[in-house]
């Protein structure tokens, strides 16, 4: 009877049931982690849910052996949901806000990203590290943290361990920058505006920039976020350039497909930027987009955190940490020098 019932089930229904059974356990675990991260953020607003989520993933995967049934859903979150989160990230950007920074500061931001990437690649070459690992760290530290790592990973042949290492380093060094930039701003006697621009130009994750800008105070938060979002906008051309380079080199993915000239999620990101900049969206829509972006990226961060085995991180050696320190120092220095030059006199 059961065999006849199964045979009589429409193929689409069978497929849908199979997909649900495959991904539900992992996605349910990610959802619980996102809920916990959101609750922590509600009571401690200075703590990013993205950081909480990745820490939860790291702790959980190193304390217990996760059931194999959760693996497909966790992998889906760390890849597909992350890219969808990047699409909704575009709703945070408004061209007019970025243009209000003025040409000199926009030129500085381009120098921060370009100088950070090329300088980090040079340091990685001197350290004789694998080029794909170097590129992930360079873009993550120079553009927008884990989202940039994911964006670059989507157009290169990076290994999973390299992605996880780059994200872990972004979390570690970006978190250390939260108290450092406000402290250095005070020691150097910088104004809140300059301190905010410095924070936005040097710190890796948007959430980390928000935390540092809030500590600096005096209006630093607003300008810090705008500068940071200007860096985020450069993810699109960088990803497109890297994808084009991969096509020129004849790279194909494991399924035999060549990378697109411009990744689909980058086109979605740009579409959201254009939508936000040209259409007067209701506050409710913007808020919903922000919530979706945070939830999706938090789920992705939890998924990436579940791939961080402390033992494996120890085995990668000291070179990635040296490169991360060098990249952070370089980006921070360019951001400070450029910001000061644009505000002389």
Swiss-Prot record:
Q: Which GO terms describe its cellular component?
A: plasma membrane
Q: Which InterPro entries match?
A: UPF0324_pro
Q: How does it sit in the membrane?
A: Multi-pass membrane protein
Q: Does the keyword Calcium apply?
A: no
Q: Which residues form a coiled coil?
A: none
**Keywords, alphabetical:** Cell membrane, Membrane, Transmembrane, Transmembrane helix
Is GTP-binding tagged as a keyword? no
Q: Which residues cross the membrane?
A: 15-37, 44-66, 81-103, 105-124, 134-156, 163-185, 205-227, 261-280, 285-307, 320-342
Q: Which locations, inside or outside the cell, does it occupy?
A: Cell membrane
Specify the domain of life of the species encoding this protein.
Answer: Bacteria
Assign the protein's first listed, main location to one coarse class: membrane
Q: Which family does it belong to?
A: Belongs to the UPF0324 family.
Output this protein's name: UPF0324 membrane protein Cgl0015/cg0018
Species the sequence originates in: Corynebacterium glutamicum (strain ATCC 13032 / DSM 20300 / JCM 1318 / BCRC 11384 / CCUG 27702 / LMG 3730 / NBRC 12168 / NCIMB 10025 / NRRL B-2784 / 534)
């Amino acid at each position: 009877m059961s065999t006849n019932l199964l045979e009589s089930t429409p193929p689409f229904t069978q497929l849908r049931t199979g997909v649900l059974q495959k991904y539900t356990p992992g996605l349910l675990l990610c959802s619980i982690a996102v809920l916990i991260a959101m609750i922590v953020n509600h009571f401690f607003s200075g703590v990013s849910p993205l950081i909480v989520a990745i820490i939860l993933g790291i702790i959980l995967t190193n304390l217990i052996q996760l059931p194999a049934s959760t693996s497909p859903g966790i992998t889906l979150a760390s890849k597909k949901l992350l890219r969808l989160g990047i699409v909704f990230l575009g709703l945070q950007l408004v061209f007019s806000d970025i243009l209000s920074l003025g040409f000199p500061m926009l030129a500085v931001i381009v120098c921060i990203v370009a100088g950070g990437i090329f300088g980090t690649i040079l340091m990685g070459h001197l350290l004789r590290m694998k080029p794909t690992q170097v590129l992930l760290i360079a873009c993550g530290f120079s553009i927008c943290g884990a989202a940039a790592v994911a964006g670059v990973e989507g157009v290169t042949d990076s290994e999973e361990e390299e992605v996880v290492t780059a994200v872990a380093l972004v979390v570690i060094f970006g978190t250390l920058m939260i108290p450092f930039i406000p402290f250095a701003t005070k020691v150097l006697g910088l104004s809140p505006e300059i301190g905010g621009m410095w924070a936005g130009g040097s710190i890796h994750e948007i959430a980390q920039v928000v935390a540092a800008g809030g500590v600096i105070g005096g209006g630093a938060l607003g300008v810090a976020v705008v500068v940071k979002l200007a860096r985020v906008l450069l993810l699109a051309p960088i990803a497109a350039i890297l994808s084009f380079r991969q096509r020129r080199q004849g790279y194909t993915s494991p399924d035999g497909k060549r990378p697109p000239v411009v990744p689909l999620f980058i086109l979605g990101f740009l579409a959201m930027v254009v939508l936000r900049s040209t259409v007067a969206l209701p506050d409710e829509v913007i808020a919903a987009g922000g919530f979706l972006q945070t939830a999706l990226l938090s789920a992705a961060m939890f998924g990436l955190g579940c791939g961080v085995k402390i033992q494996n991180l120890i085995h990668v050696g000291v070179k990635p940490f040296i490169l991360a320190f060098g990249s952070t120092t370089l980006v921070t220095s360019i951001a400070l020098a450029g910001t000061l030059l644009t505000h002389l006199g």
